[in-house]
Regions:
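Active-site/ligand-binding-proximal alpha/beta "capping" segment
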Residues: 200-248, 254
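Glycine/small-residue-rich loop that forms an oxyanion/phosphate-binding "nest" at active or ligand-binding sites
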Residues: 74-107
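Boundary-proximal intrinsically disordered activation/regulatory segments immediately upstream
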Residues: 1-74, 159-161, 281-283
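Structured adenosyl-cofactor binding patch, chiefly the S-adenosyl-L-methionine
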Residues: 106, 144-148, 159-174, 232-283
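Short glycine-rich anion-binding loops that position phosphate/pyrophosphate groups of nucleotides
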Residues: 43, 64-66, 111, 204-207, ...
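RNA substrate-binding interface of SAM-dependent RNA methyltransferases
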Residues: 44, 51, 79, 85-90, ...
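Glycine- and other small-residue-rich loops at beta-strand/loop junctions that grip anionic moieties
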Residues: 12, 38, 130-131, 156-157, ...
Length: 283
């Protein structure tokens, strides 16, 4: 794809175009759910989404902003069935939802968030995010999950949806490489029991530090919102309660940081006992 408009390629030059208004409306959860789509912005994020098997319905690109590498991504999206639409800079700046846009935005089918569709491997490691409010934290946890080979990330009683553009952005596209689901606390607890997952609750009130806990075998690590922590339901059902040792004045860490520390302690232990080997982990 070149910077010159190709024959038959749709081009939109007006920010008031009805189609552009529809894209902007997808920032709202209700509109995304009704259309069963979400937005992915950014060259790196769209490349990862395509590599993970995502198939965009449409891709909007601005040649002035994206450069040659972005045009190759647009070509790749087109080869995978996406309608590619060229837009002017003012149009792209209207549909963009982040600072410093690089001229690529895709509309993709909504992710399945059905708990029953999650398939777990032997000795699965699962992350459960209970009542998390901030999309940025969910996205950051997805990046950790992808890097650590986590089997799934489950949102229990979610405040936001997986299709929130800020979740997608903070995940750097890894939301398309890690299975996700959403359900009520009761449903997630029942699902964990069905799959014989030991529940480990992360709480600053725990007496046991994470390095002293056995984090091998089928395991679900539960983290809660920073202000309220895990609910009584999680604390009562947890087989283990663990904390991260703190030596300063603060009594807790950002939830995504906590999730990363605990997850990598679990990975360390699994590598040590042979549940993972370096090659499998790196995949």
């Amino acid at each position: 794809m070149s910077a010159v408009r190709r024959a038959g390629e749709l081009e939109i030059t007006s920010p008031s175009n009805p189609r552009i208004k529809q894209v902007v409306a997808l920032r709202r959860r209700r509109e995304r759910e009704q259309a069963a789509v979400t937005l992915v912005e950014g060259q790196a994020e769209i490349k990862l989404m395509l590599a993970a098997g995502g198939r965009p319905k449409a891709l909007y690109y601005c040649a002035e902003l994206t450069g040659p590498s972005g045009l190759f991504v647009a070509d790749d999206a087109s080869e995978h069935g996406a309608e590619v639409i060229r837009v002017t800079r003012p149009v792209f700046e209207k549909i963009s939802y982040r600072e410093g846009p690089d001229g690529l935005l895709a509309v993709v089918p909504a992710l399945s968030a059905d708990l029953d569709q999650i398939q777990l491997p032997v000795n699965a490691l699962v992350l459960i995010c209970a009542g998390l409010e901030k999309p940025g934290n969910l996205g950051a946890i997805l990046r950790t999950a992808d890097a650590a080979g986590v089997a799934a990330v489950i949102a229990a009683d979610p405040v936001t949806d997986w299709g929130n553009p800020n979740v997608v952005r903070a995940s750097k596209g890894t939301i398309f490489s890690v299975p996700v689901a959403s359900a009520s606390t009761d449903a997630v607890l029942a699902w964990a029991a069905k799959h014989e997952l030991r529940i480990v609750a992360a709480t600053p009130e725990a007496s046991q530090i994470l390095s002293d806990a056995d984090l091998t075998g089928p395991l679900a690590i539960a983290v809660g919102a920073e202000q309220t922590g895990l609910s009584t339901a999680w604390l009562e059902r947890a087989e283990l309660r663990i904390r991260i040792p703190m030596f300063g004045l603060a009594d807790s860490l950002n939830v995504s940081t906590s999730a990363a520390i605990i997850t990598y302690e679990a990975v360390r232990q699994r590598l040590r006992v042979g549940e993972l080997n370096q090659r499998e982990w790196a995949r």
